[in-house]
A protein has these predicted regions:
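Short hydrophobic beta-strand element within catalytic cores of glycosyltransferases
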Residues: 226-229
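Conserved donor-binding/catalytic core segment of Leloir-type glycosyltransferases
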Residues: 113-130, 135-138, 149
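Donor nucleotide-sugar binding/catalytic pocket of nucleotide-sugar-dependent glycosyltransferases
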Residues: 71-85, 90-107
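Nucleotide-activated donor-binding/catalytic signature segment of Leloir-type glycosyltransferases, i.e.
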Residues: 162-191
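Active-site proximal beta-strand in glycosyltransferases
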Residues: 26-56, 71-75, 95-99
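Short alpha-helical segment that forms part of, or immediately flanks, the ligand-binding pocket
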Residues: 194, 217-222, 236-237
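A charged, aromatic-enriched C-terminal amphipathic alpha-helix characteristic of glycosyltransferases
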Residues: 4-9, 250, 254, 271-306, ...
Length: 313
């Protein structure tokens, strides 16, 4: 199975859940403007998932003459859209927000919410998004009833990206392997990971990266995990009131200490019955973040885009 990041996975779901005729009638480019040449006959849509400050798109958006090149801009969160609006004054009448979503034929949900004394945690994001904080916290936790499995690698973006970038994170991988309460699992493909989330109680994700949405956080909450994370970027929008939030600070040692304290507090929470709250959390994401639901948003949107383009012609 080819490695794939969130953008590639969501594009595959779009093609799975949305009418192919509607997709073929437009041209959708993901994140990086003009990485696919503009189509002179179809409506051109930029599905923007990257942050406004990324070097592969900032100069393009900074030049306002470019803004008319796309018929529509689709953003993955309101947080992301409003950043582009404020930074670049993108045309508001040609922007919309359609969230990322979950393929529930792949995601397996937790069903066992029995109170427990031992908790299993996972870290399932790229190494630069907060792995160093998670490992520093685990280094300070001496409780044998708290363990962390680390699924993190640059391989998610393919062999070329890994060959160019993985070496800088080798010390983190080695540290994960050396800690007695941490298991370094390496790369795990998305489909397999969707079957594993149910086996963990907590997603330990002390994000130090401004997420424009955070698919892994959404999937963890939807599976029925408790999420420990920061309030950075679009995380509060994606995760609502469900996580245990740590106020973000760029003081990494302090953030690690706060995370360790939160982990021990969450461990105590599992001594009680959490079933009702976690099942409500599962129901919330099934209601609003199922690709069957989001796919209808896309179909309605594309139908309107196609009609406008046809009338213009």
């Amino acid at each position: 199975m080819q490695p794939a990041g969130g953008t590639e996975i969501q594009l595959a779901y779009l093609k799975k859940y949305v009418n192919q005729g509607a997709i073929d009638a437009v041209q959708i480019t993901t994140s990086v403007p003009e990485k696919i040449p503009l189509d002179p006959l179809k409506a051109n849509i930029l599905w923007e998932k990257n942050s406004w400050d990324q070097p592969n798109l900032y100069p393009w958006f900074k030049n306002k003459d470019n803004h008319s090149k796309y018929d529509w801009y689709v953003f993955n969160s309101h947080w992301n859209y409003h950043n582009f609006r404020k930074q670049f004054n993108v045309p508001e009448d040609r922007c919309t927000v359609i969230k990322n979503a979950i393929d529930y034929t792949e995601l397996q949900l937790k069903t066992d919410f029995t109170p427990k004394d031992k908790i299993k945690m996972c870290y399932i994001s790229t190494p630069w998004r907060g792995l160093e904080i998670a490992l520093a916290a685990m280094e300070g936790i001496k409780d044998p009833n708290v363990t962390l499995d680390v699924y993190s690698s640059t391989e998610i973006y393919g062999k070329q990206f890994k060959d160019s970038n993985d070496s800088k994170y080798l010390p983190l991988y080695e540290k994960a392997k050396s800690l007695p309460n941490v298991n370094y699992m390496g790369y795990c493909d998305h489909t397999t990971l969707m079957s594993k989330l149910k086996d963990y109680d907590v997603n330990c994700f002390p994000s130090i990266w401004e997420e424009t949405f955070c698919i892994s956080a959404m999937e963890s909450l939807a599976a029925g995990q408790i999420l420990i994370t920061t309030d950075l970027g679009a995380l509060p929008e994606t995760c609502c009131e469900f996580p245990v939030y740590i106020p973000y600070t760029n003081n990494k040692p302090k953030l690690a200490i706060q995370l360790a304290e939160c982990i021990l507090q969450v461990k105590n929470m599992f001594k009680h019955d959490l079933k009702d709250g976690l099942q409500f959390q599962q129901e919330y994401y099934k209601r609003f973040y199922d690709w069957k639901y989001i796919g209808q948003h896309w179909e309605n949107f594309l139908r309107g885009v196609i009609n406008v383009k046809r009338n213009q012609g």
